[in-house]
Design a protein with these regions (language model features):
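Hydrophobic alpha-helical membrane segments
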Residues: 1-249
Length: 249
């Protein structure tokens, strides 16, 4: 029977990886967060500007109730667009960070370039398939959630390893087009019997999250890389080199 690491062992692996290099880990996660936040602000500002230009001035609102409704709809539309855009950016940045952590675990002496590494998912090599995985998993999870919230959560964990599988398969077969749907299916198969274990791993960070909030958010600078890297450590433990060539060991 295959033996897998405990939550404590996975976290210990992450802390050992970051020993003396927490600065690299923090910068790797911080820069995408700042970019996403700036993009969010830009979209909000542009949306409000468009709303103001296409509607009657404020002093005329009392003469036409429909105008204020239009402004409200425009504002809500702008907020919705900014939320969706920032959500997609945040998800893709997280994928790029996870890719970097995967390389880092396999090469503990890897030199980290925060901007370049966190943006790697936007390269020609990864972007299209990674984006398709995001779209497909979002659709599948939403459809399952329509039945009841629990099936949606279960599917979220079933699909959780698709991005890392995609990265490994791209490395394993660089001249082949990797199917996003196949990566999702492979993740479902890989996570059979392990979804609860992964769920408990993520829940184990709740206490750290509370402390990060109490520190006025400063603690998240350490928590985000710690949590993201531990998820990758879980994948490494789960696959045990399944998608690697012999020369990669």
């Amino acid at each position: 029977m295959e033996q897998y690491k405990t939550r404590a062992e996975l976290k210990s692996d992450t802390k050992e990886l970051f020993r003396g290099r927490w600065k690299d880990a923090i910068l790797l996660n911080l820069i995408p967060t700042l970019i996403t936040f700036i993009a969010f602000l830009v979209i909000v500002v542009v949306s409000f500007s468009i709303a103001n230009q296409t509607n009657t001035p404020i002093e005329n609102w009392t003469n036409d109730s429909y105008v204020s409704e239009d402004i409200g709809e425009s504002t809500n539309s702008g907020n919705g667009t900014s939320n969706v855009t920032s959500g997609i950016l945040s998800a893709l940045f997280t994928v790029g960070i996870s890719f970097t952590f995967l390389d880092w675990f396999r090469d503990p002496y890897k030199k980290i370039h925060p901007i370049k590494n966190s943006l790697q998912v936007f390269s020609r090599k990864y972007f299209l398939r990674a984006f398709l995985i995001y779209i497909l998993t979002s659709i599948f999870t939403t459809l399952w959630s329509l039945l009841f919230i629990i099936p949606g959560i279960i599917k979220h964990y079933a699909y959780s390893q698709a991005y890392l599988i995609y990265k490994d398969q791209t490395h394993l077969s660089p001249n082949e087009k990797i199917s996003s749907l196949n990566c999702i299916t492979e993740s479902k198969n890989l996570m059979k019997g392990h979804k609860w274990r992964f769920f408990l791993l993520e829940m184990s960070f709740i206490g750290w999250g509370i402390l990060a909030v109490l520190s006025l958010g400063i603690g998240f600078l350490w928590l985000f890389p710690y949590e993201n890297a531990t998820r990758v450590a879980f994948y490494e433990d789960l696959t045990k080199g399944k998608y690697l060539n012999e020369q990669d060991y």
